[in-house]
Amino acid sequence: MAKKNASLLVKLVSTATKTTKTGEEKLTGYFCVKKRNPKNLPKKLEFRKYDPVVRRHVLFKEEKLK
């Protein structure tokens, strides 16, 4: 039998905020999905990636994939 893959799918969510017409700030809601092996990377992932909603490179933080 083949070994079970140890990689987990995690969701990286943009931390950028966007101001709405009413003046309140909300997250852009943009995210991407990556694989992470918890044996090799025990800490949560953080990347600076491009967010097309705000058209800038911003910090993306790991969240659980639902």
UniProtKB/Swiss-Prot annotation:
Give any Gene Ontology cellular component: large ribosomal subunit
The alphabetized list of GO BP terms reads: translation
* Keywords from the named record: Ribonucleoprotein, Ribosomal protein
Protein name per the record? Large ribosomal subunit protein bL33
Q: What Gene Ontology molecular function terms does this protein carry?
A: structural constituent of ribosome
User: Which InterPro entries has this protein been placed in?
Assistant: Ribosomal_bL33, Ribosomal_bL33_sf, Ribosomal_zn-bd
Give the protein family: Belongs to the bacterial ribosomal protein bL33 family.
Name the domain of life this protein comes from: Bacteria
